[in-house]
Amino acid sequence: MKKRIIQSLLAIACCVTVALSAIPTAEAAMRASVVTGKVTLNGQVIDNKTAKYPLLIYSNITYFPMTYHLSRFMGVSADWNNGSKTLDITAGGARTAYAAETGKKQSGSVSVTLPSYKISVNGAQINNKEEKYPIFNYNGITYFPLTWAYAVD
């Protein structure tokens, strides 16, 4: 009887372990660094030391936070499509004046995560997990890589 109870408990534990491992993780963690040098975007000097959402570096590429104001300043828009659960990022929008968003001083290495939702850039769906320079999230904000392919092409 005791052996049967132990076998049943082990079987239940195995089933729970398998079931929990099948649940996809929402986001994968990575590390990025806060940009420490002088930052100029579109001719505007950015005070990254006190920025609420600082520019970050990942794999030697600078990433900018897609806040409402900074995105418009860069001529980029990000729209959430609730039907398809996709973040649509589009370049070429009207640019606005720079509006600083200040916060606490940040420096060093920070934890960033890959989003679990789908992403399209200029109408093309991307496989963000396979990107050399993926789009990621930090402090609830989407960060976009300033690569040649995205910034110029």
Language-model segment annotations:
Residues 13-15:
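Hydrophobic membrane-insertion alpha-helices, especially the h-region
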Residues 2-11, 20-153:
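Primary recognition of N-terminal secretory signal peptides and signal-anchoring hydrophobic helices
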